[in-house]
Swiss-Prot record:
Domain of life of the native organism: Bacteria
Subcellular location per the Swiss-Prot or TrEMBL entry: Cytoplasm
Gene Ontology MF annotations: ribosomal large subunit binding
Sorted UniProt keywords: Cytoplasm, Protein biosynthesis
Source organism of this protein record: Nostoc punctiforme (strain ATCC 29133 / PCC 73102)
CDD domains from the UniProt entry: RRF (cd00520)
Stated family: Belongs to the RRF family.
Gene Ontology annotations for the cellular component aspect, listed alphabetically: cytoplasm
One GO term of the biological process aspect: translational termination
Major location (coarse): cytoplasm
Protein name from the UniProt record: Ribosome-recycling factor
UniProt-listed Gene3D superfamilies: 3.30.1360.40, Ribosome-recycling factor (1.10.132.20)
Length: 182
């Protein structure tokens, strides 16, 4: 039970790290760059993707077509104020975002950001392991499981931790390759 719970939490950490990686620009247009953009729609922060169709007609352009034409200006303002680092171009019916090629300094910055996200994922996995080990030790102390069972569960937990940490490392290597490929 403890191992299954830890496994699902570790899987969530890997998925969270993957989502964080998706927000990092790689020099190619990707609609997920706008996932964190919230638009002030009638006083409430609303995700951009629920107000507009977002597409990538080519490798260097993101096209945003609002479902309602009157939301063009507030969408443009939200993108300008967000931290995506792209300047919107409003032509009256759609908003275009041109993705400039990344400079080598910008690529290094994005690799650092990816490394930071990966480390946060690894720390989360280690914290899950620590909490699970505490639970196993409590069971052992309460004589619910034997010392051998406790040791086996802790060994299995360490194997799980290694597996999920290596998944994050693989995701990081893939993201670094994406970022550094010109």
């Amino acid at each position: 039970m403890i191992l299954a719970d830890a496994k699902s939490k570790m899987q969530s950490s890997v998925e969270s790290t993957q989502r964080a990686f998706n927000t990092i620009r790689t020099g190619r247009a990707n609609a997920s760059l706008l996932d964190k953009v919230l638009v002030d729609y009638y006083g409430s922060p609303t995700p951009l993707k629920s107000l507009a169709n977002i597409s990538t007609p080519d490798a260097s352009t993101i096209l945003i077509q609002p479902y309602e034409r009157n939301t063009l200006n507030i969408i443009e303002k939200a993108i300008s104020l967000s931290d995506v680092g792209l300047t919107p171009s409003n032509d009256g019916s759609v908003i275009r975002l041109n993705i400039p090629p990344l400079t080598s300094d910008r690529r290094k910055e994005f690799v650092k950001m990816a490394t930071k996200y990966a480390e946060e994922g690894r720390v989360a996995i280690r914290n899950i392991r620590r909490d699970a080990i505490d639970s196993i030790r409590k069971q052992e102390k309460a004589s619910e499981i034997s010392k051998d069972e406790s040791k086996d569960q802790q060994d299995n937990l360490q194997k799980l931790t290694n597996e999920y940490t290596s998944r994050i490392d693989a995701l990081l290597a893939e993201k670094e390759k994406d970022i550094t490929t010109v």
